[in-house]
Amino acid sequence: MTIELTPGGLLIAIEGIDGAGKTTLARSLATLLEQAGARVVLSKEPTNGPWGTQLRQSAATGRLSAQDEVDLLLRDRREHVEALIAPALARGEIVILDRYFPSMVAYQGAAGLPLDALLAANDFAPRPDLLLLLDLPPPTGLARIRARGDAPNHFETQDNLERCRAIFAALQLPGKHVIDASADADSVLRQAHAVVVAALADRLRVGATHTDAEKAALELLSAGRPA
C-alpha cells in the first residue's frame, strides 16, 4: 500500500548549520517513510555531479570566491531539479533533500552576498512543502564535527556558523518548522516525523480524489511513528 500524492508530490528540505544532524535525519526519515509505504527519493546538495564535486573540493580548500561558489551551486541545482527533483515530484513521490537552496542563502549570505539576490537567483527551484530547520548552537555543531573525526573546513568556524544560523532563523519561507537539534537523534526524528504526518494529513483533507487505500496508508504512516 502506497501514498500517492500526484500531482506535485511532497518536497522536504532539511537544513541547518554543519553538525546539526541533517544527513542522519534525512536517512532515518526516508527509511521510516518507506517502511510505512511511502515512495521516497532521498538526495542531497551539492550533488555528486561535476558541479557538486567541484564545490566539495572548494569547501576543503577554500580556493573559490563566494560568487564562484554561487555560480557552481546554481548550475548544480538546475541539473538536480531537472534530472531528479521535478520528475520525482511529478510522479507523486516524497523527495527528501539533505540541504537545498536555503543553505546557499545562509552560507553565501554569511560571506557577504545580498540575501535578496541569492533568493531571487533560486526562483527556478521548486519551493519545499516542508523546510525542517535543525537549530543548533555552533559550539555544539563544531564539537560533533570533531567527534566524528572530521577536520572543520573553511566554512566551519564559530563566527561563520553564528552568521549562518542567524540567516537560517530569519528566512521567511512557507512550510518552515524549527526543530531542536541539540536533542538526541531519536528525538529529532520524532519531531520531524510528526511534522511530515501532519502535512500529509492536510494534503488528504483538502484533496477530493484520494482513495481509501491512500487514507489507509496515511493511517499506517501515522501509526509508524518512531518510539
From Swiss-Prot:
Broad class of enzyme this protein falls into: transferase
Reactions that this protein is recorded to catalyse: dTMP + ATP = dTDP + ADP
GO biological process: dTDP biosynthetic process; dTTP biosynthetic process; dUDP biosynthetic process
Enzyme Commission identifier(s): 2.7.4.9
CDD domains to which the protein is assigned, alphabetical: TMPK
Gene3D superfamilies referenced in this protein's UniProt entry, alphabetically: P-loop containing nucleotide triphosphate hydrolases (3.40.50.300)
Keyword set includes Transferase: yes
Residue numbers binding ATP: G16, I17, D18, G19, A20, G21, K22, T23
UniProt-listed Pfam families: Thymidylate_kin
Swiss-Prot/TrEMBL keywords: ATP-binding, Kinase, Nucleotide biosynthesis, Nucleotide-binding, Transferase
Gene Ontology MF terms in the entry: ATP binding; dTMP kinase activity
UniProt keyword Repressor, yes or no: no
GO cellular component: cytoplasm; cytosol
Job description of the protein: Phosphorylation of dTMP to form dTDP in both de novo and salvage pathways of dTTP synthesis.
PANTHER family noted in UniProt: THYMIDYLATE KINASE, UMP-CMP KINASE 2, MITOCHONDRIAL
UniProt similarity note: Belongs to the thymidylate kinase family.
Protein name from the UniProt record: Thymidylate kinase
Species: Xanthomonas campestris pv. campestris (strain ATCC 33913 / DSM 3586 / NCPPB 528 / LMG 568 / P 25)
